[in-house]
Amino acid sequence: MHALSQEPTVWHGTTILTVRKGGRVVVGGDGQVSIGQTVIKSNARKVRKLGKGDVIGGFAGATADAFTLFERLESKLEQYPGQLTRAAVELAKDWRTDRYLRRLEAMMIVADKEVSLVLTGTGDVLEPEAGVMAIGSGGNYALAAARALIDTDKDAESIVRKSLDIAADICVYTNRNITIEALSAE
C-alpha cells in the first residue's frame, strides 16, 4: 500500500515509440509517472541518448530499474563499441540469468543509426517490423497510429509526435509532455 490511496503500489505507465523513416530514427516518449490512479510526475524524461550519443534509449516500467538497465547497456556498449545488437543480446543474457537483474521491471527501446531493438526482461531482443515499434501502456495505440502514418508524407519526428498524441487521447497513463531524440540513420 502507499499513502496516495488504499491500493497496492502499482506503477503504471508510459508510451515509448520508435520510427525509422527518411534516413532518420526517432524515439519519443511521454512524461507521465503514475502510482495507482494518481499522477506523481508529468515531466519525467524517459528517452535519452546513451553512450557517446550514438544510441537512443527509451524505457517503460520502474524508473530505478530502467536506469540500472541503461547503465548496464552503456557498459556493454563500451565492451562492444558500434555493435548495438551484440551489446543488447549480451545485456539480455545477463538480464535473464542474473538473480538481481531478473527482478527488474522495465522494457527498453534502443536505437542507433542502423537498428532499432526492444529489450525485455524475458531475454527477448526484437527488431521492429517496418521500422516502427512501441512499448508501454499506450504502446499499442501509438504503434497502430504510427503504422497508419508511416506511408504518408510525414517525416519520422512528425509521425512520432502525432502517434504519441493519439496514444495520450486513449491511454490514461500517457500524457502529451513528449521527449524526442533523433539520429541520422545514414
UniProtKB/Swiss-Prot annotation:
Primary location group: cytoplasm
Cell compartments where the protein resides: Cytoplasm
GO biological process terms on file: proteolysis involved in protein catabolic process
Swiss-Prot/TrEMBL catalytic activity: ATP-dependent cleavage of peptide bonds with broad specificity
EC numbers on record: 3.4.25.2
CDD domains recorded: protease_HslV (cd01913)
Domain of life of the organism encoding this protein: Bacteria
One GO cellular component, as annotated: HslUV protease complex
Regulation: Allosterically activated by HslU binding.
Pfam families per UniProt: Proteasome
Record field: transmembrane: none
Molecular functions (GO terms): metal ion binding; threonine-type endopeptidase activity
Binding-site residues for Na(+), renumbered to this chain: 168, 171, 174
Active site: 14
Keywords: Allosteric enzyme, Cytoplasm, Hydrolase, Metal-binding, Protease, Sodium, Threonine protease
Family indicated by similarity: Belongs to the peptidase T1B family. HslV subfamily.
Self-association state and partner proteins as the record states: A double ring-shaped homohexamer of HslV is capped on each side by a ring-shaped HslU homohexamer. The assembly of the HslU/HslV complex is dependent on binding of ATP.
Record function comment: Protease subunit of a proteasome-like degradation complex believed to be a general protein degrading machinery.
Record's protein name: ATP-dependent protease subunit HslV
Lineage: Bacteria, Pseudomonadati, Pseudomonadota, Alphaproteobacteria, Hyphomicrobiales
Gene: hslV
